[in-house]
Amino acid sequence: GRPSARYDAPYCSEEELQACDCSHNPVRDACQCAYDPAGSPACDCYCVEPWRR
């Protein structure tokens, strides 16, 4: 894979984590939230398989 960013991105807030709801997704029902390494100020949450968290 590509090298990880070498700077500390801010963590997603608890509210953003709570707002991510993947329960409607039968397979990818686990939330993974992270800041975009490209420098986006928005917290990006997406649904992943539980074992990929």
From Swiss-Prot:
Its main location: secreted. Residues 1-5 form a propeptide. Expressed by the venom duct. It comes from the Eukaryota. Contains 4 disulfide bonds. Disulfide bonds: none annotated. GO terms for molecular function: ion channel regulator activity; toxin activity. One of its GO terms (cellular component) is extracellular region. It is found in: Secreted. Keywords: Disulfide bond, Ion channel impairing toxin, Neurotoxin, Secreted, Toxin. Probable neurotoxin with unknown target. Possibly targets ion channels. The cysteine framework is XXII (C-C-C-C-C-C-C-C). This is Conotoxin Cal22e. It comes from Californiconus californicus.
